[in-house]
Amino acid sequence: MAKKLTLMSKKSSLADARGGPPLRARKVALAKTSGRMLDGLLDRLAIREIVENWVLYRDAGDWERFRSVWHEDGYMMATWFQGSHEEFAAISKAGMEKGVNIVNFLGGSTIDIAGNRAVAQTKMSISQRAPVEGVMCDVVCVGRFYDFLAKRKGKWGIVLRRLFYEKDRIDPVDPSQSLKLDPEVLKRYPVGYQHLAYLQAGLGFPVKTNMPGLRGPDAERLYGLGRAWLANKPMDETFRA
């Protein structure tokens, strides 16, 4: 029995040494694994580039290239706007020309990929400057972009962008000025973006009042939509509610 085992071991080693089937099979498996890892890395790099380009193109007013980060049916949801990415670009462009001052900053990302779908969460802050109760103010809101993405014809793009609004603050640009807010107006809005909403409502924007915060039912519902997207569920109106 021992002799048979030794003989089999020698044959196996010889086959490996000569590049026989066992070695070739391992090489094929390794190549497939390496290929999948490379594809996954390239997908993540492409998605992160989309997230970064969104901010740079929007803040620079580069609307032609801004459109390139979206798929044709791309939809944008923010405190002050819910609609197609084309409408968002047009209204943002018009606002910039009238002096609306909004800039965005990015932090780290986490990206979940399932086949040709992905969900990307990215830490961000929104800074908007405008007069509030007669005082020029800056509002800074921190949160996360929550992007639903798809790969179509080999190209990743945003299908839906939603946001988590985690906390915000308001400060007079001139610290020597004092600011008094109407507490009744302030409490109409969720704590995660109540100062941003106060400012935007004062500018005449209709502000959505159920955007997700750091925690709570609205946040959990959005996480659930992310899981549904990765599970290949169709995107219906519940994703935009």
Over which residues does each language-model region extend?
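Short beta-strand edge/turn micro-motifs at domain boundaries
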Residues: 3, 121, 144-176, 184
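Charge-dense, low-complexity intrinsically disordered segments
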Residues: 37, 41, 79, 136
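Short, surface-exposed coil-to-beta transition loops
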Residues: 104-106, 140-145
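A hydrophobic membrane-anchoring alpha-helix module
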Residues: 181-241
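Short, cysteine-centered beta-strand-loop-beta hairpins and adjacent loop/turn segments enriched
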Residues: 127-137, 168-170
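Short, low-complexity N-terminal intrinsically disordered segments enriched in polar/charged residues
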Residues: 2-3, 7-60, 68, 241
